[in-house]
Regions:
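C-terminal active-site subregion of NodB/CE4 polysaccharide deacetylases
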Residues: 1, 6, 11-32, 38-43, ...
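Aromatic- and acid-rich polysaccharide-binding/catalytic face
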Residues: 142, 146-160
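Alpha-helix initiation and capping sites
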Residues: 132-135, 139, 156, 164-167, ...
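Residue-level signal for short, function-critical loop segments
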Residues: 104, 158, 194-197
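Structural detector of well-ordered beta-strand residues that form the stable sheet scaffold
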Residues: 99-101, 153, 224
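Active-site beta->alpha N-cap acidic-glycine motif
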Residues: 1-144, 148, 199
Length: 242
């Protein structure tokens, strides 16, 4: 985060490795959850239906029960992790929690925010659906998550194989995410590649990597694989890859 702040201030910041100072007996690690969207296909299969802001201002999950009622509780990672940290506050370093990554094709956080839900055709078939309210509620929850210590990230718009699709599809997907999702979460500089499909091989990114440069142009600085290990970290002058 300091990178962009210093850059806007006219400085010339660079990424560099530093020692991680932790209390004795503690281990640094990155926790992430991708696809925090509660897709339509998950309805009725025992998953939470969406994340809402609870009465205490903290994010919590809703779940549709078999009888049609709505139950509010710890039905997914976010509220479960929050409860654990309340009992074990030393688990979290300076309030840091998990990285949550979103696609966009079905919306985010259980809210139907994709552009397709705002079309006249969809509205005609769902007259009680309020597209603008869905987006407003998603943005409210996203802010609550950030206030609660979570980092928000991209998981591509269409859950695409970002290392294999054509450059044309790559640009289209990235632009859709930038248009439909980024404004709801306040932007991000983190991307978690779907399927662990990176945009290069194991060697460091090169300046002539067209996909790398395009993602950087959209503000991304942290490039992560969902199946990475703690030993795989590459730090460039203006980005980190893990």
């Amino acid at each position: 985060k300091d990178y962009e702040t210093q850059k806007k201030a006219g400085k010339n910041p660079v990424f560099k490795a530093e020692d991680i100072m932790l209390p004795p007996g503690k281990q640094a690690f990155v926790m992430s959850q991708d696809d925090v969207c509660y897709y339509e296909y998950m309805d009725g299969d025992g998953f939470a239906s969406r994340i809402v802001v609870g009465e205490d201002g903290k994010p919590v999950c809703e779940m549709k029960m078999d009888d049609g009622s709505i139950s509010v509780g710890a039905y997914d990672l976010v509220p479960l992790l929050d409860e654990f940290i309340e009992e074990h506050p030393d688990f979290s370093y300076r309030g840091a929690k998990a990285v949550l990554a979103f696609t966009g094709y079905n919306g985010i956080l259980g809210y139907r925010t994709a552009a397709s839900y705002g079309t006249a055709e969809y509205q005609a078939g769902h007259p009680d659906f309020n597209y603008e309210e869905e987006k407003a509620q998603a943005a409210k929850v996203a802010q609550a998550l950030k206030d609660d210590g979570y980092e928000l990230a991209s998981h591509s718009w269409g859950h695409r194989d970002m290392g294999a699709i054509s450059m044309e599809d790559f640009v289209t997907d990235t632009n859709k995410w930038d248009t439909e999702v980024a404004p709801l979460i306040g932007g991000t500089d983190i991307i978690l590649f779907p399927f662990g499909s990176d945009i290069s091989d194991w060697r460091p990114y090169k300046d002539d990597n067209e996909r790398f440069q395009y993602l950087k142009s959209k503000g991304f600085r942290y490039f992560c694989n969902v199946d990475s290990s703690q030993y795989y970290v590459q730090i460039g002058t203006d980005h980190m890859r893990q």
